[in-house]
């Protein structure tokens, strides 16, 4: 079934400029709908971690993009909280039974779009989770945090207030941004452009990471890009230019996570009971 969906999506993608709510075939509509529904339930995800590393299923991302060509805008919600959009809200039709089955908390006015997966014991404070995102068990998405389209958030992650996790839809990115298990992302930090923060890492308040951000390891003196090694403690910093005329923003790995760091950033099970 997945192979059939993929083939239909790939073929539709090649013809995407000709797609519209009027012109799309029933086969394409059904393939896109099934893919979005599977994303919503966590049966499919845009990226998966394997022994060889992260694998990105580009065809699923294409299905998300195609969904915008197949839907007309419609009014959703009720005054004074009315919206006009193509993507339904994830919880629009939920009743008490559906929320209990989901096993997560949604604090008003948190918003998740249909096609985002929210796992058990997740807490959504007043935040935003975009289509295609995957938020795994025990994670806290704190107030005014944003989980971008197709972003992958691991288990027991804390996204602090105002954190931004970048999406892939605009500007169009090849790979999703990934925050692995047991990470703590400090307030107002931004991780975008497909950067991977490996498991058990801690980003201090105000760390900004894109593919062009230098990541400086204080212990080794090495500079890398696009990936924070597992167990890193990262703070904002700057590095001087070669001629010493100016400095540019960077992220600095100051140490590896230790017991003291864990004590300061551990999650509170009482909030997930």
Swiss-Prot record:
<keyword id="KW-0012">Acyltransferase</keyword>
<keyword id="KW-0028">Amino-acid biosynthesis</keyword>
<dbReference type="GO" id="GO:0008666">
    <property type="term" value="F:2,3,4,5-tetrahydropyridine-2,6-dicarboxylate N-succinyltransferase activity"/>
</dbReference>
<dbReference type="Pfam" id="PF14805">
    <property type="entry name" value="THDPS_N_2"/>
</dbReference>
<dbReference type="GO" id="GO:0005737">
    <property type="term" value="C:cytoplasm"/>
</dbReference>
<dbReference type="GO" id="GO:0019877">
    <property type="term" value="P:diaminopimelate biosynthetic process"/>
</dbReference>
<dbReference type="GO" id="GO:0009089">
    <property type="term" value="P:lysine biosynthetic process via diaminopimelate"/>
</dbReference>
<dbReference type="InterPro" id="IPR001451">
    <property type="entry name" value="Hexapep"/>
</dbReference>
<dbReference type="InterPro" id="IPR037133">
    <property type="entry name" value="THP_succinylTrfase_N_sf"/>
</dbReference>
<keyword id="KW-0677">Repeat</keyword>
<dbReference type="InterPro" id="IPR005664">
    <property type="entry name" value="DapD_Trfase_Hexpep_rpt_fam"/>
</dbReference>
<keyword id="KW-0808">Transferase</keyword>
<dbReference type="InterPro" id="IPR018357">
    <property type="entry name" value="Hexapep_transf_CS"/>
</dbReference>
<keyword id="KW-0220">Diaminopimelate biosynthesis</keyword>
<dbReference type="Pfam" id="PF14602">
    <property type="entry name" value="Hexapep_2"/>
</dbReference>
<keyword id="KW-0457">Lysine biosynthesis</keyword>
<keyword id="KW-0963">Cytoplasm</keyword>
<protein>
    <recommendedName>
        <fullName>2,3,4,5-tetrahydropyridine-2,6-dicarboxylate N-succinyltransferase</fullName>
        <ecNumber>2.3.1.117</ecNumber>
    </recommendedName>
</protein>
<dbReference type="InterPro" id="IPR011004">
    <property type="entry name" value="Trimer_LpxA-like_sf"/>
</dbReference>
<comment type="similarity">
    <text>Belongs to the transferase hexapeptide repeat family.</text>
</comment>
<dbReference type="InterPro" id="IPR023180">
    <property type="entry name" value="THP_succinylTrfase_dom1"/>
</dbReference>
<comment type="pathway">
    <text>Amino-acid biosynthesis; L-lysine biosynthesis via DAP pathway; LL-2,6-diaminopimelate from (S)-tetrahydrodipicolinate (succinylase route): step 1/3.</text>
</comment>
<dbReference type="GO" id="GO:0016779">
    <property type="term" value="F:nucleotidyltransferase activity"/>
</dbReference>
